[in-house]
């Protein structure tokens, strides 16, 4: 069972910046081929390390605020946040 969370701009602060454990954020889009290729690996990581790291996917087409804030210019882009 996957533990990957579908995030968005409105929950980014709580789910990512205020998380007690490290968070891997996948900035992606549904039309992106490489994003689709990396998705199964992220699913596996989310299961294997479910209590050690949180994985959140942010669709950049629908959620542009934090993609712009962190300078996301190509996708997929993976960023790790630890304690904000």
How would you label these PLM feature ranges?
Residues 4-23, 64:
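A short beta-strand-turn-helix
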Residues 8, 28, 54-56:
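Conserved Rossmann-like nucleotide-binding pocket used by diverse enzymes
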Residues 20-22, 37-58:
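Conserved helix-turn-beta segment immediately C-terminal to the redox Cys motif
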Residues 23-24, 42, 65-66, 76-84:
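A short, hydrophobic beta-strand/beta-hairpin element that forms part of a small beta-sheet core
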Residues 58-68:
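Structural microenvironment flanking redox-active thiols in thiol-disulfide oxidoreductases
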């Amino acid at each position: 069972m996957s533990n990957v969370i579908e995030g968005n701009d409105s929950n980014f602060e709580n789910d990512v910046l205020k998380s007690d454990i490290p968070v891997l954020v996948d900035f992606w889009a549904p039309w992106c081929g490489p994003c689709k290729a990396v998705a199964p690996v992220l699913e596996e990581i989310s299961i294997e390390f479910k209590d050690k790291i949180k994985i959140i996917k942010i669709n950049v087409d629908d959620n542009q605020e934090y993609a712009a804030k962190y300078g996301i210019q190509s996708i997929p882009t993976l960023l790790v946040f630890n304690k904000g």
